[in-house]
């Protein structure tokens, strides 16, 4: 139980670091954001998790991923929930339009591909304790419909 709490707190720290990076790189106008349609890779995020975790984390390179590039409903729901929680405690939004609730904002950020979170998919855990994972940016994934 303590390891799981530790990993959750580490992931929360990594998410906060990623949000800060994304907010610094956020472009206000949509015309400019279409011109700069590249994903900012931040290997330091992964390295921080590897160093802080009790398990060794092996990140599969982007060009060697084996899982689907479509978010599962669970992953999409989890992203919306985590982002809504951040927004509820005065997180800044990546949208110009005003919405009534943090959940609505989080859903729109996901559908507009502006959500500042990453998806980590565990592929397997080896007998020597290495955790093999893929890290996806939701901007490069298909998004399921959420009700």
Curated annotation (Swiss-Prot):
GO CC aspect terms: DNA-directed RNA polymerase complex; host cell cytoplasm; virion component
UniProt subcellular location: Host cytoplasm; Virion
Keywords carried by this UniProt record: DNA-directed RNA polymerase, Host cytoplasm, Transcription, Viral transcription, Virion
Region called Disordered, residue ranges: 20-39
Pfam families according to UniProt: RNA_pol_Rpb6 (PF01192)
Predominant cellular place of this UniProt entry's protein: host cell
Gene Ontology process terms (BP): transcription by RNA polymerase I; transcription by RNA polymerase II; tRNA transcription by RNA polymerase III; viral transcription
A single GO molecular function term of this UniProt record: DNA binding
Family: Belongs to the archaeal RpoK/eukaryotic RPB6 RNA polymerase subunit family.
Protein's UniProt name: DNA-directed RNA polymerase subunit 6 homolog
